[in-house]
A protein has these predicted regions:
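Extracellular polysaccharide-recognition and catalytic grooves
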Residues: 1-115
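Generic recognition of long tandem-repeat/solenoid scaffolds
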Residues: 118-122, 230-236, 287, 293-298, ...
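Intrinsic-disorder/low-complexity loop/linker signature
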Residues: 93, 169, 175, 188, ...
């Protein structure tokens, strides 16, 4: 919902003013910059009548696409407006902007125990990794990629969760997808890391594809943090339908996001899956398949999903139309008969 950015703007303006009062100009400027970035994000979601798209898609209000049961055009516009007014009241426009952490990056923030997330940023290129998805809201794996100077919704900006009826508290099923591995076994079974939700703090009332008698181990390793680039590796060890270990190595620098997936086990082939926004409710994404890559273009940005290993891989699409918060998605993929697969998401192509 767009009120999240409005709430962030309030927090950042308060901190900017407090740091300025302490004479800490650089910190104050960083929070001022962050407040402006939050408000700029809201500016992407203004309707022709001046109200906001409360969820980040452009479907008509009456469709309620991507809404929660408690979402409504009225109260969430009012909440966002009220929060922006509060931000205005706290704002000190004598504070000059300085770079914020989201501009510079150089960090990997591991929040395993409570939020089961990893956040990482290098030079404004950013990812969110969901270590153990709640299937009502998130798949497991790499669910969000935002690249500097691109359309954030193309990232993708969200994974694909199950459809959930909040009023009846009922899981309506569906397909779970994130950026990451899918594997096929000799018997024809198809499995994805994204499906192994609800595995860190399991709740038996929620879906998980994991059937092992012992919970898997989830480790975040090989964290690297520098101004030039950041990296981390997520390793799952357990019983994943023929696979005993899944590793995703994520490297971020100014050129984009590079991912290497390694599976240990008896698999017939491995695919790298990439959820593509194909329709935001008002505009369909332009999709261009070229040798070893697919280029997406929508509104003010482009992004490229590119196969690195195996070389000469062909990128295909599943030709699905899966509803999720940002609109409808299809899945781009390429495959390998090896247990290692590598790819890149970039704006440089």
């Amino acid at each position: 919902h767009i009120w999240n950015e409005a709430a962030a703007a309030v927090t950042y303006e308060i901190y900017a003013s407090q740091y300025a009062a302490l004479g800490k100009k650089q910190e104050a400027g960083a929070f001022k910059r962050a407040a402006h970035l939050a408000l700029r994000s809201i500016g992407r979601w203004i309707r022709e009548d001046g109200s906001g798209f409360i969820v980040k898609n452009r479907f008509p209000i009456e469709v309620m696409h991507g809404y929660e049961s408690y979402s409504a055009q009225s109260q969430y516009n009012l909440l966002a407006c009220w929060l922006m007014c509060v931000a205005y009241l706290y704002a000190d426009n004598s504070i000059k902007e300085s770079p914020s952490p989201s501009d510079i990056g150089g960090y990997v923030l591991v929040m395993k125990d409570v939020f089961h997330k990893v956040f990482a940023n290098s030079g404004g290129n950013y990812v969110e990794y969901e270590l153990s998805g709640d299937p009502r809201y998130n798949a497991t794996g790499l669910i969000r990629i935002h690249l500097k100077n691109s359309n954030p919704q193309l990232g993708p900006s969200d994974g694909i969760p199950h459809k959930w009826d909040n009023k009846k508290k009922q899981d309506l099923g569906g397909e779970l997808y994130a950026v990451g591995p899918e594997w096929h076994d000799a018997a024809g079974g198809v499995y994805r890391l994204a499906e192994y939700t609800n595995i860190l703090f399991p709740d038996t009332s929620y879906f998980s594809a994991y059937k092992g008698s012992k919970l898997p181990e989830i480790d975040v390793r090989n964290v690297r943090q520098s101004v030039d680039g950041v990296a981390f590796e997520v390793v799952y060890t357990g019983r994943f339908d023929g696979v005993t270990q899944i590793s995703q190595r994520v490297y971020i620098d100014h050129t984009g996001i590079t991912v290497r997936d390694i599976l240990k086990g008896n698999v017939k082939k491995v695919r790298a899956c990439y959820p593509m926004l194909i329709d935001d409710g008002m505009e369909e994404t332009k999709i261009d398949f070229q040798d070893g890559k697919v280029i997406l273009q929508s509104r003010d940005g482009q992004i490229c999903f590119q196969a690195i290993s195996p070389p000469n891989a062909t990128i295909q699409r599943k030709r699905k139309r899966i509803p999720y918060r940002n609109g409808y998605a299809d899945i781009a993929y390429f495959e390998s008969d090896k247990n290692v697969i590598q790819y890149k998401i970039t704006t440089e192509f």
